[in-house]
Amino acid sequence: MAANPSGQGFQNKNRVAILAELDKEKRKLLMQNQSSTNHPGASIALTRSPLNKDFRDHAEQQHIAAQQKAALQHAHAHSSGYFITQDSAFGNLILPVLPRLEAE
């Protein structure tokens, strides 16, 4: 099966066009950012984003808390072990509590 060289040329041209458009948008945004620092009134739209971010963070925390509660209830109902909710570096919602046994 022979590759279609004209199709590859079209893909390359398409990629170049997309990259050029992205570069143009990047420059446009950089220019807007520079002009907004020169004009304090222009940065009003930028100050609203932390409020939305805080709202999303709060909603995400509530969702995680609900997931932790459900996972904890399930673990206690189906296991004889003891579990706690704690942030995990690996994304675990609950962690098992293991007793320390002293060496004899």
Swiss-Prot record:
Main location (coarse class): nucleus
Cellular compartments annotated: Nucleus
InterPro entries in alphabetical order: SOSSC (IPR031821)
UniProt keyword list: DNA damage, DNA repair, Nucleus
Signal peptide: none
UniProt entry tagged with the keyword Nucleotidyltransferase: no
Statement: the UniProt record of this protein carries the keyword DNA repair: yes
Quaternary context: Belongs to the multiprotein complex Integrator. Component of the SOSS complex, composed of SOSS-B (SOSS-B1/NABP2 or SOSS-B2/NABP1), SOSS-A/INTS3 and SOSS-C/INIP.
Function, as annotated: Component of the SOSS complex, a multiprotein complex that functions downstream of the MRN complex to promote DNA repair and G2/M checkpoint. The SOSS complex associates with single-stranded DNA at DNA lesions and influences diverse endpoints in the cellular DNA damage response including cell-cycle checkpoint activation, recombinational repair and maintenance of genomic stability. Required for efficient homologous recombination-dependent repair of double-strand breaks (DSBs).
Family: Belongs to the SOSS-C family.
This protein's name: SOSS complex subunit C
Species whose genome carries this gene: Taeniopygia guttata
